[in-house]
């Protein structure tokens, strides 16, 4: 349901070469392909009115985000996301042209995070500022820890977004985030 949940989409695959235009890459086999900062084909980006961002699918408000390429979740991950929240700062994932939720249905979210100082985060699924479901967590500890929560939608929505907000501000390192419906079969 989340796009770029491991924050690696804008990291060029090994052996690929970024062209000067910032859009195309040369693959290891010599083919020229579109990369668009990890968004994929430019026609998909333009056709779906995807706003530009340095880390695909992730947007901030009163916060700074940057890729962390050394302090990752484990040796199988190429990146983590370092967040510096100001007071009332937020981080939003747009999903694949929105996140679809159904009233009364539950969704399992888990994330790996760590923080030098304890930080409170509010996790919500919302549409145009209206919270459809949410929960809170406290992140602490200098090792990645898994945090799990259930989110149950209050109403149907096909264009929701996941937002992680921080009332007090602070820094957190996110290693991976997953959001999946509990009911995956008809």
For each feature predicted by the language model, list its residue ranges.
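Extracellular and organelle-lumenal recognition/adhesion modules and their flexible linkers in secreted
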Residues: 1-186
């Amino acid at each position: 349901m989340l796009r770029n949940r491991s924050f690696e989409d804008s990291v060029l695959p090994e052996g690929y070469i970024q062209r000067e235009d910032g859009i195309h890459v040369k693959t290891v086999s010599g083919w020229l392909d579109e990369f668009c900062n990890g968004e994929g084909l430019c026609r998909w980006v333009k056709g779906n009115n995807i706003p530009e961002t340095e880390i695909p699918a992730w947007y901030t408000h009163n916060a700074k985000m940057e890729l962390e390429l050394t302090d990752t979740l484990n040796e199988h991950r190429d990146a983590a996301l370092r967040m510096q929240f100001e007071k009332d700062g937020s981080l939003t994932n747009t999903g694949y042209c929105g996140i679809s939720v159904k009233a009364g249905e539950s969704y399992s979210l888990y994330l790996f995070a760590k923080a030098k100082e304890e930080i409170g985060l509010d996790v919500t699924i919302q549409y145009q500022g209206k919270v459809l479901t949410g929960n809170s967590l406290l992140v602490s500890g200098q090792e990645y820890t898994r945090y799990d929560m259930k989110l149950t939608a209050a109403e149907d929505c096909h264009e929701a977004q996941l937002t992680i907000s921080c009332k007090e501000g602070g820094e957190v390192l996110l290693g991976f985030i997953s959001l999946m419906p509990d009911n995956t079969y008809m």
